[in-house]
Structure formats: structure tokens, C-alpha cells
């Protein structure tokens, strides 16, 4: 049935007044619109803190929009790749193969291989029961010189555990090798930005002739491993 343009829309059930909102779930869980925008700081920004690493996202077009915008905004498209998952890939039940072969194709086309790959799987991998152990094992066998970091872009799962951002912040430090403690060195972890030169922590370390290390200040893979 056609409706006159400009006809008043009944928002009952579709909107909640601020005075009626309840914490922590102001809206009843249901179908939600995915806005084609990105936040001020997201998983792409955090992942780009790792030097000499490449981010690869395996997901559908809809989920790809925000991260692509971020990579373009940061001017780091040369460190960003993606594998598009289509409907037939879901129906055929071969998401593992699509992920493995897609990532392999991306890496084979690179003239210079990255030291690490932050591989982002998504909600679809959870829904379809994708064997991620097989995916990572196969990729590690094909590219033994590359460190594969397990990352997730699965916000639909965040009500049942850590958010994608929290999981990423943990994952980017997992490749660090265990080394003998250096009593003269201090590693400052978790910050998105390098501390100012005259920050209190840096001044204290310098006063004791120490070495101050932080991820945002790493320029090479060797710098990262020294953390």
C-alpha cells in the first residue's frame, strides 16, 4: 500500500526517550542498523601501531566499510588488505578454504612480505563454526617466516566476553618472545600514543640512565621484539 510522502511516522517501539532509557541496555536487543561510518579510534588504528605488519580482514562488504575508511584516512592503504566473503561462500560451507586461499593470494602478490599479519576474522566465522585452528595452522605452514596474530572483528559477540578492541590489545603483545629481564629497561604497554619527551615516566627512567620502550615508538620489527 502506498503512503503519502511526508506522512507522520509512528516511532512507537522504535525510539526510547532518554528519561526512559535504562542501563546497561537502553534498547531491546534486535535487528540493528550498521551505520557506514567509523569511530575516532578503532581496531585499525590500534593494529597499525605494530611496525612492519599488515592487516588482513576477511569479511563481507558491509563490515568492510568502516575499516577501509579508517585505512584510507590514515593513509596506510599499503599496509591494509581484505578478502571479501560472498553469499555463495557461506552456502558452500568452505569458509576455511576461502580464508586460507584469500590470505595466501594477498601475501603471494606482495613483493616484500610483512614480518607479521594481523588476520581479522568476523562474526560469520563464529556463526558457521569455522575451524580457525586449521586456518592458522595452514597459513603458518605456508608462510613460516611470518607471524600470524589472531584478531577478531566480532562486535556481535561482545556481550559474552571481551570486545574486539580488548582482544586486539592483548593479541598484539602475544608474539613477544620471553627474554631475560633487563634491569635498565622499562616497557610501557597499552598506550595508543607515544608519551611526551618530558613525561614523568620518561624523565624518571632517564634520570636512572635507563631505556624507555613503548609500542607507539617502535620503528621496526626489531624494536617491537625488544619490548
Role assignments for model-derived ranges:
Residues 1-227:
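An N-terminal assembly and electron-transfer interface module characteristic of large anaerobic redox
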Amino acid at each position: 500500500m502506498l503512503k503519502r510522502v511526508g506522512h507522520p511516522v509512528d516511532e512507537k517501539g522504535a525510539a526510547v526517550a532518554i528519561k526512559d532509557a535504562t542501563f546497561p541496555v537502553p534498547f531491546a536487543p534486535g535487528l540493528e542498523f550498521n551505520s557506514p561510518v567509523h569511530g575516532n579510534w578503532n581496531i585499525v588504528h590500534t593494529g597499525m601501531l605494530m611496525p612492519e605488519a599488515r592487516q588482513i580482514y576477511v569479511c563481507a562488504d558491509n563490515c568492510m566499510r568502516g575499516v577501509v575508511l579508517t585505512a584510507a584516512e590514515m593513509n596506510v592503504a599499503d599496509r591494509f588488505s581484505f578478502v571479501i566473503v560472498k553469499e555463495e561462500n557461506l552456502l558452500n560451507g568452505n569458509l576455511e578454504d576461502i580464508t586460507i586461499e584469500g590470505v595466501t593470494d594477498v601475501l603471494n602478490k606482495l613483493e616484500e612480505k610483512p614480518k607479521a599479519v594481523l588476520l581479522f576474522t568476523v562474526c560469520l566465522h563464529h556463526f558457521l563454526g569455522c575451524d580457525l585452528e586449521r586456518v592458522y595452522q595452514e597459513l603458518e605452514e605456508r608462510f613460516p617466516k611470518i607471524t600470524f596474530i589472531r584478531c577478531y572483528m566480532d562486535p556481535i559477540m561482545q556481550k559474552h566476553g571481551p570486545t574486539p578492541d580488548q582482544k586486539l590489545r592483548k593479541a598484539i603483545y602475544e608474539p613477544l618472545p620471553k627474554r631475560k629481564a633487563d634491569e635498565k629497561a622499562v616497557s610501557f604497554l597499552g598506550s595508543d600514543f607515544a608519551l611526551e619527551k618530558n613525561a614523568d615516566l620518561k624523565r624518571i627512567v632517564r634520570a636512572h640512565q635507563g631505556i624507555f620502550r613503548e609500542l607507539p615508538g617502535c620503528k621496526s620489527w626489531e624494536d617491537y621484539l625488544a619490548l
